[in-house]
Amino acid sequence: MKKHFLLAGIAALMLAACNNKPASELTLSGLDPAKFQTEVNNAQTALYTLKNKAGMEVCITNFGGRIVSIMVPDKNGKMQDVVLGFDSIADYINVPSDFGASIGRYANRINQGRFVLDGDTIQLPQNNFGHCLHGGPKGWQYKVYEANLIDPTTLELTLVSPDGDENFPGNVTAKVTYKLTEDNAIDIKYSATTDKKTIINMTNHSYFNLAGDPSKTSTDNIMYVNACLLYTSDAAD
């Protein structure tokens, strides 16, 4: 009987050891990269970590080109995660959302899911109250990008979208490059090439909470957009 208790105790200790990852294997935000490793539509997903010399950290998964966490120092130097995200790829798959995603082919709404191109009317999926939102129900936020970690601060993601993807015309090769600068800025650059006239409108869909605590409200956050042009949309756009 004592032997059985001893074996059970050893098994419990081994299980506990497996469930408690050493801090060195976790990201600064506490993410376990192993929980982002799976296969979606025959493509491998993973978590990529960017770090600069100042200690800032950005975690990105190639599933949807999503920013998962941004650890940045507050005014007192305390590191805080300022974006909303999930702790595993399973959560992103099982709870569909746009958290942190690279949106495409077309961000925002296309009225009634229709647009005219060279005199032809293109009908898209209507996935949002009769309109096409964020490229349709199978938009790029649910695709697996090919990832290339260029250096510790730069990640390039590439996605090939075939002609007719969600009924958009043209074969499109899209690239999203994330660059973490040494002055704690995130530079996101988008580019796309196509073999046929089409429409493209890419963006990032991160949700920020500068309190660094998702249980606190963000209603007192102030955002400044350094833009030369402003587009105002309505419920149908």
Where are these regions (language model features)?
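C-terminal motif of bacterial Sec signal peptides marking the signal peptidase cleavage site
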Residues: A16-A17
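Polysaccharide-binding surfaces and accessory modules of carbohydrate-active proteins
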Residues: K78-M79, G85-I89, F208-L230
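Conserved small/polar residues in nucleotide/adenosyl-binding loops
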Residues: Y231-D237
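Active-site loop/turn microenvironments that scaffold catalytic and metal-binding pockets
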Residues: K78-W140, I222
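Beta-strand-rich N-terminal accessory domains
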Residues: F36-V82, F86, Q112-I122
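Extended, loop-rich substrate-binding clefts of extracytoplasmic carbohydrate-active enzymes
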Residues: L26-G30, A34-Q44, K51-K53, T121, ...
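Acidic, contiguous internal or C-terminal segments within carbohydrate-active enzymes
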Residues: K51-N52, M56-N62, P162-S215
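Sec-dependent N-terminal signal peptides
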Residues: F5-L13
